């Protein structure tokens, strides 16, 4: 489908038999070529200056100078720089403009070699450090992440580069524009506590219950840990909103998720073969310049680009209508407000309808799709949202942290009782008389019980740390995919809307052309009648012809004025059209020009219709294929996450049982 569509649509785009060429930097001149030209030109200038100063030099010296220049050119061509010239003879004879244009890129960088489809590589972020490189104020620093591209077959073969968080953001934004149908992996959000106040208003009951158990904690305040009730919000999942995490833990969290992002991109063939992605991993590439260059080659909107590959967009896509209306609200805070409204409605219905909320929540999840999908696709479409794993995880983590605080308080209380009892007169007198009654050992029993809660606090703190990194973190990453799927679905809906707008546009243009052709036919008939009558009646016929022409023009105006009551019609356009009709000195010529322009426009729009049919078919097939494979993979990931969660709970429970059994034996010995 993709090859056939591309051959029809992008006729100006070259086709490749072996593999797809995604290089966004064609016909660029290399750095070594510029250096070679600069050196040779400098050498020739020095030689000319020497000839002027020394007129008595013989041809032998001139030949030596030429040989030296030739050797310098050979050294440049045989260097290990990234770009080399294919035409060495031209370098030896001196570069000119034609030679400069004939330079081609014929190298394979280490990054490109490691990113071959059959290579076994992985990426990891080894460290994150502060840097002030490029900052005007050197006292201000930013975090830089060190990326390692490692060959698993040869661990010594590795490439290391350093990128900022904003570089990861720009990479993902460009990938979304190039491949709007591919599920681009998420990256960790930069701002962790976005709209926490609004989330507190919606989730006040949960946050209130968690605050009561965490106000006395030394480092485990979880009021924001339970403020978000929707797993689809990518910036508010449980792990990153835990306020007890310090900056270092958050940086480590971001390192892990950014490593997952890069490795997930490696698993996508379209991204892995993209030269732009290789530039991101190349330490010699200036990423700011690369972003500027690639952005200039992409359309301004993804709705005017080739859905298969934005870098192969044909110029005819610019004639498509814009499916995004001017009245649409595109604000960053609108989506969280809508999601919080849904949750508030759900809670209200639960109170009013005695927990019967399925009917009210079903319309929100059952999003109507313009394309008929398979039943399995619709069933698994919102698997992450319907499971509510992130909501349950927030509550469980809040309970665990509250339980840890309770263990701390209980351990302190029992230890205090033990100290109080040990200083009581009854215990002191029993010790003095060597009395072994049970009352004399009560302080020891309280001390052992206090040790139970102290050790239980240690085990549950270990459990919380493991769940944060091994359960909450991958679960939060999985939650972010729901927003990505919604973005792709919105793209599909708007492309279908774009197709309908295109059909309406073609219909209106054809109707307008038909009216103009009728007017032109009537005008030609009147002109023929005028030429057929005697000259004596010319004045009368002229007046009648003028009236008839005015009637034709008035009919055209009435045809154009049929849209005046439409709400989307711009009043300024009507006024402009009215003024144009008044000052037009040659309406016949204007009408002919409009007919020619409309015929060309209709021809272009009909070509766009053919493109849209192919694009809609391709989009439907790709979404069905990508979503099906994604959900299969995602269900496997969630299954592994739950298995890991189960293992942590079992291990924690066993440790608690061992603690109680051990203390029980010690108490029995007393």
UniProtKB/Swiss-Prot annotation:
Residues 1-29, 42-96, 207-233, 536-555 are annotated as: Disordered. Residues 55-72 have a biased composition (Low complexity). The keyword Membrane applies. Signal peptide: none annotated. GO terms for molecular function: phosphatidylinositol binding. SUPFAM superfamilies: PX domain. InterPro entries: PX_dom (IPR001683), PX_dom_sf (IPR036871), PX_Snx41/Atg20 (IPR044106), Sorting_Nexin_Autophagy (IPR051079). PROSITE patterns: PX. GO terms for cellular component: cytosol; endosome membrane. CDD domains: PX_SNX41_42. Residues 539-555 have a biased composition (Polar residues). A 1,2-diacyl-sn-glycero-3-phospho-(1D-myo-inositol-3-phosphate) binds at residues 164, 166, 190, 254. The keyword Transport applies. Residues 123-288 form the PX domain. Keywords: Autophagy, Endosome, Lipid-binding, Membrane, Protein transport, Transport. GO terms for biological process: autophagy; protein transport; retrograde transport, endosome to Golgi. It is a peripheral membrane protein. May be required for cytoplasm to vacuole transport (Cvt) and pexophagy. The PX domain binds phosphatidylinositol 3-phosphate which is necessary for peripheral membrane localization to the perivacuolar punctate structures. Belongs to the sorting nexin family. This is Sorting nexin-41. It comes from Debaryomyces hansenii (strain ATCC 36239 / CBS 767 / BCRC 21394 / JCM 1990 / NBRC 0083 / IGC 2968).
């Amino acid at each position: 489908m993709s090859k056939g569509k591309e051959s029809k649509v992008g006729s100006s785009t070259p086709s490749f038999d072996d593999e797809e060429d995604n290089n966004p930097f064609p016909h660029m001149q290399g750095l070594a070529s510029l250096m070679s030209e600069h050196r040779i030109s400098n050498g020739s200038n020095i030689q000319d200056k020497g000839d002027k100063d020394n007129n008595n030099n013989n041809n032998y010296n001139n030949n030596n100078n030429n040989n030296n220049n030739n050797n310098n050119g050979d050294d440049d061509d045989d260097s290990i720089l990234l770009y080399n010239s294919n035409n060495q003879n031209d370098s030896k004879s001196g570069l000119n403009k034609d030679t400069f244009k004939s330079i081609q890129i014929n190298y394979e960088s280490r990054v490109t070699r490691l990113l071959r489809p059959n290579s076994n590589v992985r990426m990891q972020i080894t460290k994150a450090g502060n840097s002030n490189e490029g900052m005007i104020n050197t006292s201000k620093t930013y975090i830089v992440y060190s990326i390692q591209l490692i060959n698993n077959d040869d661990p010594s073969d590795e490439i290391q580069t350093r990128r900022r968080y904003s570089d990861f953001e720009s990479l993902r934004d460009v990938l979304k524009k190039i491949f709007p149908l591919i599920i681009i992996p998420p990256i960790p959000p930069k701002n962790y506590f976005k709209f926490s106040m609004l989330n507190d208003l919606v989730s006040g009951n949960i946050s209130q219950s968690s605050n009561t158990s965490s106000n006395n904690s030394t480092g485990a305040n979880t009021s924001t840990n339970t403020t978000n009730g929707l797993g689809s919000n990518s910036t508010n999942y449980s792990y990153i909103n835990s306020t007890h995490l310090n900056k270092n833990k958050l940086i480590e969290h971001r390192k892990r998720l950014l490593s997952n992002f890069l490795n997930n991109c490696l698993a996508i063939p379209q991204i892995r073969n993209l030269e732009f992605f290789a530039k991101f991993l190349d330490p010699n590439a200036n990423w700011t310049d690369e972003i500027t260059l690639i952005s200039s080659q992409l359309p301004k909107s993804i709705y005017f680009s080739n859905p298969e590959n934005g870098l192969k967009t044909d110029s005819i896509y610019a004639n498509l209508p814009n499916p995004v209306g001017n009245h649409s609200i595109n604000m960053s805070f609108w989506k969280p407000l809508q999601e919080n409204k849904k949750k508030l409605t759900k809670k209200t219905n639960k109170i009013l309808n005695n927990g019967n909320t399925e009917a009210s929540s079903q319309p929100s999840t059952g999003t109507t799709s313009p394309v008929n999908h398979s039943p399995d696709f619709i069933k698994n479409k919102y698997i992450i949202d319907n499971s509510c794993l992130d909501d349950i995880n927030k509550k469980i983590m809040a309970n665990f942290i509250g339980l840890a605080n309770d263990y701390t308080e209980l351990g302190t209380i029992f230890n205090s009782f033990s100290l109080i009892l040990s200083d009581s007169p009854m215990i002191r007198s029993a010790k003095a008389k060597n009395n072994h009654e049970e009352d004399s050992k009560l302080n020891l029993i309280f001390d052992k019980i206090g040790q139970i809660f102290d050790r239980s606090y240690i085990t549950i703190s270990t459990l919380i740390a493991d769940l944060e990194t091994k359960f909450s973190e991958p679960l939060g990453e999985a939650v972010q995919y729901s927003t990505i799927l919604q973005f792709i679905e919105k793209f599909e809906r708007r492309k279908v809307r774009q197709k309908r707008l295109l059909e309406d546009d073609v219909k209106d243009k054809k109707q307008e052309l038909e009216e103009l052709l009728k007017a032109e036919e009537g005008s030609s008939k009147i002109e023929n009648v005028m030429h057929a009558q005697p000259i004596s009646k010319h004045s009368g016929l002229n007046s009648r012809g003028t009236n008839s022409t005015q009637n034709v023009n008035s009919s055209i105006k009435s045809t154009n004025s049929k849209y005046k009551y439409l709400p989307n019609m711009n009043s300024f356009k009507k006024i402009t059209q009215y003024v144009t009709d008044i000052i037009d000195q040659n309406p016949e010529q204007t009408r002919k020009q409009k007919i020619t322009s409309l015929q060309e426009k209709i021809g272009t729009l009909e070509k766009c219709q053919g493109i849209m049919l192919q694009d809609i078919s391709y989009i439907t097939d790709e979404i069905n294929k990508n979503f099906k494979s994604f959900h299969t993979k995602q269900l496997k990931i969630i299954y592994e996450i739950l298995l890991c969660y189960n293992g942590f709970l079992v291990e924690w429970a066993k440790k608690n049982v061992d603690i109680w059994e051990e203390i029980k034996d010690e108490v029995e010995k007393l």
